[in-house]
Design a protein with these regions (language model features):
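Acidic/His metal-coordination segments adjacent to aromatic residues that form catalytic metal sites
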Residues: 4-8, 12, 66-72, 127-137
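Catalytic Zn2+-binding segment of zinc metalloproteases
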Residues: 1-6, 26
Length: 231
């Protein structure tokens, strides 16, 4: 964030959707990519002495992008994660509208998981007590994760277009191009403009789901890792 705006309202981040987008862009898009795995593997071999076919870069990538049902939101993959957010969003709306009593929440949660994931939590720690958000009063926060993922995909798509050598840079452990673009297009604006205006300035268009769908289809359908490696 701009130093000259520090301690001013305009010097804050734009909001939680943008903040989550920055986390997810690095955590999910960059760090679970083939270029990053190429950068990571020599470090693992040097510092931890890993070897063998299970440490083949494509096999590691397959594990990082494995899709499977999970009871726990923070352990979920990119494809099933939105369903975890939908669950919380739907139940949260029902709670606030008075359509769902707090005592009914555990069973409503379990029914959703059974219907959408074909798994059922055995205890409440795997269900409605796994997150701290409601306990600390953070109602309305969960959609920030879904919005953040969509924003991250849209930003990254434009970033790759603006920095054609980005994949090669990441594979070499050179992140100046990545973070330089983000600082200029996102961080440097602080809270000066709205979220939609920030996206228009950075990508040329307001937020849509198009880039997110294109990213997921490309990664998991058009150019997937060898799933047998991650079995």
């Amino acid at each position: 964030l701009p130093r000259e705006w520090r301690d001013q309202p305009v010097g804050r981040d734009r909001g939680m959707a943008i903040e989550e987008s920055q986390s997810l862009l690095i955590e999910m898009i960059v760090c679970r990519s083939r270029p990053f795995v190429r950068y990571l593997m020599p470090l693992l071999q040097k510092h931890f002495g890993v070897s063998g076919p299970e440490w083949d870069p494509e096999n590691v990538y397959a594990h990082l992008t494995r899709v499977r049902r999970s009871l726990i939101r923070v352990d979920a993959d990119e494809l099933t994660y939105p369903l975890h957010i939908q669950l919380r969003y739907d139940l949260e709306k029902q709670l606030l509208a008075g359509a769902l009593a707090v005592r009914e929440l555990p069973e409503a949660w379990a029914e959703f998981m059974q219907a959408r994931f074909n798994v059922r939590p055995a205890r409440q720690q795997e269900g409605c007590l796994q997150d701290i958000h409601w306990a600390v009063g953070s109602f309305g926060y969960f959609p920030s994760y879904a919005l953040g993922a969509a924003i991250a995909a849209q930003l990254f798509e434009k970033l790759r277009g603006d920095v054609p050598a980005l994949d090669e840079q990441i594979a070499r452990g050179e992140f100046a191009g990545l973070f330089g673009w983000l600082r200029e297009k996102v961080h440097g604006l602080g809270a000066k403009v709205s979220t939609q205006e920030l996206l228009k300035l950075a990508t040329g268009k307001p937020l849509t789901a198009t880039a997110s769908l294109r990213y997921l289809e490309g990664k998991y359908l058009e150019d997937p890792a060898s799933r047998s490696a991650a079995a």
